[in-house]
């Protein structure tokens, strides 16, 4: 009878067993969360060195303390001494297990999901801090690249609000339309240089003076005489070379001037015509008079 009473006290009904399983599941979830948190605290981000501030962000995610056994109450109905009989009373099925909202405004009922979200949020803050450092480093090397512009582009690409970075707070109007700007540079149309109008060159008719014609004729006669004398000399030299041990070549005969060249040149006379109009007004015609008279052939008719 004593043994039967002990078994009866320890036995749990099916209804209470369901509540007990729920309690065990809660303890299991807390232990699993603790393992995940320890793993996340030991994580090393490739390419990033965690600072003391960043480590503090990761250490802020505290776990819910496991419920103590002091909540387990003894009904006091057992007649068996406490040293031999253990009475297990599961939590009341009507009591709701309250989970404190220690993870901000994350709207979820899964405690594990809340914890993971908090850790990922801390990691995101670390990434953003590294992005800010990188932007400042680029700006130090290239002052023409603004830090705010780089951060604004980063927020747009990652679909994040500009308020993610404190440096961009209150500047939404400036950077909200950053995607609406034209990516392609404006094409600069080069204007063709104006064409220069070619000036028409009017050639003035050159007046051939009578004295120039006489000089050309005299030069032509002299050139013809020179050619004749040079041909005669060549014939003589060729005949002298045929005879061996011939006498020295005699000096060439003096050049004979043509009869036209022997003629004495008559004294030249200039035209006596005076210009009255035009650019030569007040000057006298310089054309040489050919033949008799005091006027050239051009002004002879006007002098009559």
UniProtKB/Swiss-Prot annotation:
Residues 61-76 have a biased composition (Polar residues). Residues 234-247, 261-272 have a biased composition (Basic and acidic residues). Residues 192-203, 248-260 have a biased composition (Basic residues). Residues 209-233 have a biased composition (Acidic residues). Coiled coil: none annotated. It comes from the Viruses. Residues 61-82, 178-275 are annotated as: Disordered. Signal peptide: none annotated. This is Uncharacterized protein 411L. It comes from Invertebrate iridescent virus 6 (IIV-6).
């Amino acid at each position: 009878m004593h043994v039967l009473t002990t078994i009866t006290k320890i036995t749990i009904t099916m209804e209470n067993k369901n509540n007990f399983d729920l309690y065990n599941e809660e303890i299991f979830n807390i232990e699993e969360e603790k393992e995940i948190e320890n793993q996340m605290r030991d994580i090393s981000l490739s390419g990033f060195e965690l600072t003391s501030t960043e480590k503090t962000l990761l250490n802020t995610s505290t776990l819910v303390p496991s419920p103590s056994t002091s909540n387990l109450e003894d009904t006091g109905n057992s007649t068996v001494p406490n040293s031999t009989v253990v009475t297990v009373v599961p939590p009341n099925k009507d009591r709701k297990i309250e989970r404190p909202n220690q993870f901000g405004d994350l709207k979820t009922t899964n405690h594990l999901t809340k914890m993971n979200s908090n850790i990922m949020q801390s990691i995101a803050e670390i990434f953003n801090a590294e992005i800010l450092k990188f932007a400042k480093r680029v700006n130090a090397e290239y002052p023409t690249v603004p830090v705010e512009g780089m951060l604004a582009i980063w927020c747009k690409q990652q679909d994040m609000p500009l308020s993610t970075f404190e440096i961009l707070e209150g500047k939404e109007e400036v950077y909200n339309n950053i995607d609406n700007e034209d990516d392609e540079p404006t094409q600069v149309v080069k204007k063709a240089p104006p064409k220069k109008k070619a000036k028409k060159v009017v050639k003035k008719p050159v007046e051939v003076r009578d004295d120039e014609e006489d000089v050309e004729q005299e030069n032509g006669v002299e050139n013809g005489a020179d050619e004749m004398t040079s041909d005669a000399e060549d014939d003589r030299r060729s005949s002298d070379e045929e005879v061996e041990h011939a006498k020295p070549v005699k000096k060439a005969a003096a050049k004979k001037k043509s009869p036209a060249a022997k003629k004495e040149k008559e004294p030249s006379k200039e035209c006596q015509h005076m210009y009255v109009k035009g650019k030569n007004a007040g000057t006298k015609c310089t054309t040489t008079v050919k033949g008799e008279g005091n006027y050239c052939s051009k002004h002879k008719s006007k002098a009559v």
